[in-house]
Amino acid sequence: MDSQRNILLIALALVSFLLFQQWQVAKNPAPQATQQAQSTGAAPAPSFSDELDPTPAQNVAAKAKTITVSTDVLTLSIDTLGGDVVSAKLNQYSEELNSPESFVLLQNTQGHQFIAQSGLVGPQGIDVTSNNRPAYQVSADSFTLAEGQDELRIPMTYQANGIDYTKTFILKRGSYAVDVVFDVANNSGSEATLGMYAHLRQNLLDSGGNLAMPTYRGGAYSTSDVRYKKYSFDDMKDRNLSAPNDVTVNWVAMIQHYFASAWIPRDEPQAQLYSRVINNLGDMGIRTPNKTIANGDKAEFEATLWVGPKLQDQMAATAPNLDLVVDYGWLWFIAKPLHWLLSVIQTFVGNWGVAIICLTFIVRGAMYPLTKAQYTSMAKMRMLQPKLQAMRERIGDDRQRMSQEMMELYKKEKVNPLGGCLPILLQMPIFIALYWALMESVELRHSPFFGWIHDLSAQDPYYILPLLMGASMFVIQKMSPTTITDPMQQKIMTFMPVMFTFFFLWFPSGLVLYWLVSNIVTLIQQTLIYKALEKKGLHSK
């Protein structure tokens, strides 16, 4: 197998990979937790959605007072009617490149609703009816984390039937995790029974993305049985989410490209999963078991809301397996170390584009023995071509005999006929893993390289990098020896750089940069290896 056929192999693998990823995003399998509840015979958790008024509140934020809470990284709008987070702006992430507007993750507008709701339900619950929720009292209309202050607390109070309810939001400097604590003081003269719920509500939208950049927008969850499982909007429409009673819920989330929102129960091993869809609005959340509070006693319910970018270190510290929302696919065990190495390099060079170049040299340097073995094997195969041709003329159409004698010749000459193919197959997982490492890295979002590349996570606006990449492939093709004589195969090989260029027009600039630099390294390594082969008497042409 010569290097031009390797290019064809890469192309086929690349196209197959892209089609598979697009299918995987579109056809996500049903959640494993539900399947376990059905297959093991364990009784599923009771449907919490039956406890709530099935009519969702319509634009609640427009009907009630909202307060603003600001830290260095978050600006939240909280509705005093129920204490829902109806808007979340990420102060350190812009909506668009060079835009002064912060990225809005949660919002409650006429065209789109994505909010984080939490409340108390049960016999003495105050949030059972969507349109009759508690009107909390709060001391001010806005709260700001002051300079030198590390924590900001916003208590909201409500009193009904002799029971005092306090809902407190706790935000910390530099953190996208918001603690939500309910304190209940029962002075009603009798027992009070209630539990907490917390869910995310969102319009059920399409996943988005394209063939080059397939992205997932939908739900996900983690339990003691399932470390990470996607629960798509289509799944949500088809069946309500539930899990066995003995399963511990780690978190539930709604995720999108680069960003995630999640509810994490605190000290509640019996919290239950649930979901429901009403009028194209999907709820996905957790429900804690009821607590019975004696007269004169107090109780506390707590959950944490993550609302921010997919930052792996912070998410891993917030909840078990929450960092898995950074989905590297089935080659995560390669992609995760690559992302770690890329981040380490960036801390030294200060530019993500330069870090990608350095990573490319490191990866290609590590794979140099494979590359050398590939070219050496191809050179040996070319040296055998006269003998193979003579063998074909001598044997004729007897394929079985031809195969036997070919294998004997390979064994005698110590040549592996797959030696030129296997190295390139081993390199493909590296490329695919790096593809996902770059695709899922929020750090690359709006990160510049130099010149016209202002965002490594977006396609090249002038298509210069893809064109350079295509040109480099053409040069590699011309420099590579070939034994292809079939006219059709020759046409396919000639067209291959054009096809690659077309595909890469829509790839993130960071990934195209990697492929371009990788091609340049290939040209350098190819030149050095050919010179070494010529010295050994193995012709490179």
From Swiss-Prot:
One Gene Ontology biological process: protein transport
Transmembrane segments: 6-26, 343-363, 418-438, 456-476, 497-517
Biased composition (Low complexity): 31-47
Start and end residues of each stretch annotated as Disordered: 31-55
GO cellular component, one term: plasma membrane
Entry-linked Pfam families: 60KD_IMP, YidC_periplas
Highest taxon listed in the record's lineage: Bacteria
GO molecular function: membrane insertase activity
Keyword Amino-acid biosynthesis: no
Intracellular or extracellular location(s): Cell inner membrane
UniProt keywords, alphabetically: Cell inner membrane, Cell membrane, Chaperone, Membrane, Protein transport, Transmembrane, Transmembrane helix, Transport
Main location: membrane
Topology with respect to the bilayer: Multi-pass membrane protein
Family stated for the protein in its record: Belongs to the OXA1/ALB3/YidC family. Type 1 subfamily.
SUBUNIT field: Interacts with the Sec translocase complex via SecD. Specifically interacts with transmembrane segments of nascent integral membrane proteins during membrane integration.
HAMAP family per the UniProt record, alphabetical: YidC_type1 (MF_01810)
Its biological purpose: Required for the insertion and/or proper folding and/or complex formation of integral membrane proteins into the membrane. Involved in integration of membrane proteins that insert both dependently and independently of the Sec translocase complex, as well as at least some lipoproteins. Aids folding of multispanning membrane proteins.
Protein name (Swiss-Prot/TrEMBL): Membrane protein insertase YidC
Native organism: Vibrio cholerae serotype O1 (strain ATCC 39315 / El Tor Inaba N16961)
